[in-house]
A protein has these predicted regions:
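Conserved catalytic-loop position in the HRD/HxD motif
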Residues: 90, 95
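Hydrophobic transmembrane helix bundles of membrane-integrated enzymes that assemble
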Residues: 66-68, 96, 208-210
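Helical subdomain adjoining the active site within ATP-dependent kinase catalytic cores
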Residues: 17-40, 167-237
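ATP-dependent phospho-/nucleotidyl transfer catalytic cores
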Residues: 5-88, 101-104
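Active-site activation/catalytic loop segments of kinase-like enzymes and analogous catalytic loops
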Residues: 100, 108, 120-191, 209-225
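Activation of the activation-loop gatekeeper triad in protein kinase-fold domains
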Residues: 110-117
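Active-site-proximal structural scaffolding
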Residues: 80, 84, 89, 119-127
Length: 237
């Protein structure tokens, strides 16, 4: 079993075949209280059943249902055969070293290969770098007091309404464009050509991207050291 599953499925459960949640999900969230930016608070057991409408766009799955789907799709033994690759598995910029004196092919080096492997599911291999390089701004996860954002939240009839003005910085937009052009489009095209692109590929990628922040660290307001998350950072990330 590849170590990369330790970033995803193993953080959702205690044992591989469990049909209930455990792992980091239970440690971080289950039975806890969620403090919202508007000053209200509610149990996580209620919070994760809310549907989200973000800047007018309604998400079809609640957090609970999205995690149920993730537990199924990210299982180490998938329901259908899946293409695999040799990859680092956790190659965000924090795990890359740039050597300005190196050759063109050796200027960038990977380190911390804790989740590397020879048979990593191809759709999972680039997900950590996609999230952490493009979407996870450090002011969300690590320096929340420096986060500058206009954000409002409200709950109405089971829907969590969130409006915000956050946008990707120009640099992170360039990272995203580069990843799409040089990683994701070639990968998806190759898998499709070889008849190895599962019908659930979009859901699988979305499930992995959900786990990247949610199971990386406790995202509840007040959690985290040395800089506890603010309620704004908690809901935005």
């Amino acid at each position: 079993e590849e170590a990369v599953h330790g970033l995803y499925h193993r953080r959702l459960v205690d044992k591989e075949l469990d049909e209930h949640f455990g792992g980091r999900l239970r440690e971080f969230y289950l039975g806890r209280q969620v403090d919202l930016p508007d000053g209200n608070s509610l149990p996580f057991d209620q919070f994760w059943h809310l549907h989200w409408r973000v800047n007018g766009r309604l998400h079809t799955l609640s957090l609970h249902d999205a995690l149920l789907r993730a537990r199924q799709l990210l299982a180490p033994t998938p329901a259908q055969a899946m293409a695999a690759v040799t990859a680092h598995g956790d190659d965000h910029t924090g795990n890359l070293l740039y050597n300005p004196d190196g050759s063109r092919d050796g200027a960038i080096s990977y380190f911390d290969p804790a989740f590397a492997g020879n048979h990593i599911p191809a759709l999972l291999a680039p997900c950590k770098s996609l999230y952490h390089i493009c979407y996870a701004h450090p002011n969300m996860l690590y320096d929340p007091d420096e986060l500058r954002i206009e954000l409002s939240v409200s709950i109405d009839d089971g829907v969590l309404q969130i409006d915000h003005d956050w946008q990707l910085t120009p640099l992170r937009q360039q990272f995203l464009t580069s990843q799409i052009n040089h990683v994701w489009e070639p990968l998806l095209r190759t898998l499709k050509q070889k008849g190895m692109l599962p019908t659930t590929w979009r859901d699988t990628i979305c499930a992995a991207l959900l786990c990247c922040p949610l199971l990386c660290k406790n995202l509840l307001a007040g959690a985290g050291r040395p800089n506890p998350l603010t309620a704004d950072a908690s809901i935005l990330v």
